[in-house]
Every structure is written in structure tokens, then in C-alpha cells.
Amino acid sequence: MIKAMALSSAGVVSHLHPPSFSSSSGLSVNRVLFRNRNASPCGLSLPILNPSRSVLVFARGKNRKGFVSSSSSSPKKNKKKSLDGADNGGGEEEEDPFEALFNLLEEDLKNDNSDDEEISEEELEALADELARALGVGDDVDDIDLFGSVTGDVDVDVDNDDDDNDDDDNDDDDDDSEEDERPTKLKNWQLKRLAYALKAGRRKTSIKNLAAEVCLDRAYVLELLRDPPPKLLMLSATLPDEKPPVAAPENSSPDPSPVESLSAEDVVVEPKEKVKDEAVHVMQQRWSAQKRVKKAHIETLEKVYRRSKRPTNAVVSSIVQVTNLPRKRVLKWFEDKRAEDGVPDKRAPYQAPV
């Protein structure tokens, strides 16, 4: 559109300054633009100009195959595209890369023969030789993998990596490496003890005591019990269902005579007295009878004794209530006090003074 407007403006300028060159049709531009020079310029007629190639390219680029132009594009974007098309007006039409790629694929499919034969063994050997030369391995075809890896090299690399890791671990944990040193061959008594433990089960066996007994590392004993070797399994299957012999302590005396002298007849088992179930009030009375008489209680009893050597039952009940002493204890105290003072048990009849 901008190009067409520019061309139309150029025609108007040519009206003001008419050029002297002639058109391709053999008629002068003056004749085409102004048929009557004496007449007023209101009857202006412009020649029909063919659109330039760049405008056609720009218009065609909008409607290319495989691209859908959005109707909601902003006018600024359209203006920018039109300016780019105007700048590249003199260039040739650029091909779409996707269309060129599809065209190449179609040509390859057309040229491709459907009767291709499978790869023969000779071609495979030739390919293996080329890979060997490229990798610098040699002519050994068995060590070469067609996917680009060499089996021998991979094994060597893996071994080297493992060796490196082992070296690092040994440098970092020297103490662990010393603890992990395991005997190459177990002795018969160690195998027998481990077989008994395997037969009994790990849950019923103290791993710590077992490791100390067989003089092995605890981790190694655990590994043997979790994944026992075939020899240990066979030995465990042949063992009878008996407990292993308990080793005698070193400090024990070899003569077992004192142990045998103790027989069941000599040992006398004293029967335990069965505690009878007693009532609460009986237990309370026994406890109160064992209660110690305090000094304040004695003072109260002495005050009552000064007033009456033989207190009545009401007075005794009040004393029991105040002192929380048992009744028998109170009566016993009064009897002992009368015996100390020499008061007779029976009261003598009253005699009037003469």
C-alpha cells in the first residue's frame, strides 16, 4: 500500500513537472497525463501502473502455504512488515525453509528404491573394521560393539574406577579397613558355634556375645548369619536340636564334689506363712494397741487420776476420744497407777470418824 501511494504521489509530481521521456506504448507522458493542455487540470487521468515485484512478494508472503495469518494482528505489526517488504523490494523472493525441507524429503522418497537389500555380513565386517580404525583398537572384531563402545575398554575403565574408589575409601577410613579384615578360613569350632546360632535363629542369639565367643567381628558374624555359605548351611542342617555345650569358666575348681554334696534332702525350704485376711477394725485395734503413749497423753491421764482414782466409763470414753488411745490401754494405765500408789482393788466401806 505504501509503495502504491508513493507511485501515485510520483504521478502527481509529474503533473507539475512533466518529464520529457516517452512511455513504452510509444505515446508521450504529456499526452497521457494531459490530453488537453489548455483545459483545466480537473480532468486528470493517471496511467495504470503494474504493481511492483516487491509488493507482490509481500502480498504473497502473507498467504503462504502452511501459515495462517491472524485476524487480530495489531496495525503496528502490519506496518512493520510492510516497511520490511518495502526495503527488500529489489531482492528476489525468499523460499520458505519448511517448504524446501519438505521438497527435499519428497525427492528423496521418490528417488529411494523400495527394493533395498538388507545389510550383508561383509558390510557389517567392513563397518566393524572402520570403527576399529576410528577407535584405534585394532583388528579384533569381537571386542567391538557396533553401537560405538568397546567392551574390553569398558571393563577396564570400570575396574579402574572401582580401584580408584577403593583407594579413596582406604585413604579416608584406615581404621575401618583394619576392622574389615576377615579370616579367609574359619576353624571347625567357629563353624560349629555359628551353625548352632544359625539353627537357633538370629532373634534368639546375642550377636555381641556370639562375636566375642568366636573371636570375629560383629559385622562379619551378622553377614554370615544373613547370607550363610553353603558349608555353614549343611553343617547347621546336620546338627541335632540341642543347645551348644557351655564352656566352663576358667576360675571354677575342677573338683565338682562340693556341688554334688548339696542334695535335695539337705536343703530345707521354709514354708512361707500365709497372711490371713483380717477385718479392718481388727487391724485398726492391733495398730492402736501398738501406738506409743505420748507425754501429752500422760499429762491428761494424770489430771484425771488426781480427781478420781477410779474413773467412770463416761470419763474413760472421753479420754479415748481426746487422746485417740485404745480403751484397753487407758484402763491398763489406771490399774498400773493404782498399784504404784497402793490403792486397793476393792473400795472399803465408808466409816464415819469417831
UniProtKB/Swiss-Prot annotation:
Residues 154-181 have a biased composition (Acidic residues). Its main location: nucleus. It comes from the Eukaryota. A motif (Nuclear localization signal 3) lies at residues 293-300. Residues 65-98, 151-186, 243-264 are annotated as: Disordered. It is found in: Nucleus. One of its GO terms (cellular component) is nucleus. Induction: Constitutively expressed in healthy plants but repressed in response to infection by necrotrophic fungi. Repressed by drought and abscisic acid (ABA). Keywords: Abscisic acid signaling pathway, DNA-binding, Homeobox, Jasmonic acid signaling pathway, Nucleus, Oxidoreductase, Peroxidase, Plant defense, Repeat. Changing residue 211 to T: In ocp3; increased accumulation of H(2)O(2), abscisic acid (ABA) and constitutive expression of GSTF6/GST1 and PDF1.2A defense genes. A motif (Nuclear localization signal 1) lies at residues 63-70. Residues 286-345 bind DNA. Pfam families: Homeodomain. Gene3D superfamilies: Homeodomain-like (1.10.10.60). A motif (Nuclear localization signal 2) lies at residues 191-198. SUPFAM superfamilies: Homeodomain-like. May modulate chromatin structure by regulation of nucleosome assembly/disassembly. Homeodomain transcription factor that mediates jasmonic acid (JA)-mediated COI1-dependent and abscisic acid (ABA)-mediated PMR4-dependent resistance to infection by necrotrophic fungal pathogens (e.g. B.cinerea and P.cucumerina) and bacterial pathogens (e.g. P.syringae DC3000); this resistance involves at least callose deposition. Required for the P.fluorescens WCS417r-triggered JA-dependent induced systemic resistance (ISR) against both P.syringae DC3000 and H.arabidopsidis. This is Protein OVEREXPRESSOR OF CATIONIC PEROXIDASE 3. It comes from Arabidopsis thaliana. The gene is OCP3.
